[in-house]
């Protein structure tokens, strides 16, 4: 049975997360409903990551097995037609081998978090950024972030409901970009790792925001990390600024031939 990889973009605001839920709308549910328009008996899809309620994606990847050997372009066009008006888009489809798995074949996931410092409400970016009103020191946040790079026990920075077997993860990158915006400043946090713990990114960004605001010293991040205690974490920031940006594989399934 032909297997296809799908690159998916979505606005997470109206959804209870990626994962299919019985009583609430989900991104997985929307994509699977679109697939049923093409093949009513399809077996469902598997994704690279299960984003939480309100979290967005620029490059989520999922795979599906279909009875028909679709032309990838026609498959993406057909799915987008069935997805309307949901804020979900299939950016690309690709024929992949039967050993490809969207989750288990992934080498790296990258996330983007958008934080807007502005007293005025975010109008055009409402629901797409986390807005705070206090000024932030980007150099202090960068200094605090250095303590988190590398392989660590991230118990402090994961949800108490996290189901991962181990809290040990290797964080390959945290970079913070600062750029002026009308009546404010936007900070973009870029994080890369093979995989992340539940709420890890939001816990890290929420903690670094406290460093930027002057409520924490940069070295307090190291102390919190070494505590291996969820109670030592800073506040978990709002989900609407978080984006699953990209998923990397040994070979890019969407690379043009």
UniProtKB/Swiss-Prot annotation:
Keywords: Isomerase, tRNA processing. It catalyses: uridine(38/39/40) in tRNA = pseudouridine(38/39/40) in tRNA. The active site is at residue 52. GO terms for molecular function: RNA binding; tRNA pseudouridine(38-40) synthase activity. Substrate binds at residue 111. The keyword tRNA processing applies. Pfam families: PseudoU_synth_1 (PF01416). InterPro entries: PsdUridine_synth_cat_dom_sf, PsdUridine_synth_TruA, PsdUridine_synth_TruA_a/b_dom, PsdUridine_synth_TruA_C, TruA/RsuA/RluB/E/F_N. Its EC number is 5.4.99.12. GO terms for biological process: tRNA pseudouridine synthesis. The keyword Metal-binding does not apply. It comes from the Bacteria. Homodimer. Formation of pseudouridine at positions 38, 39 and 40 in the anticodon stem and loop of transfer RNAs. HAMAP family: TruA (MF_00171). Belongs to the tRNA pseudouridine synthase TruA family. This is tRNA pseudouridine synthase A.
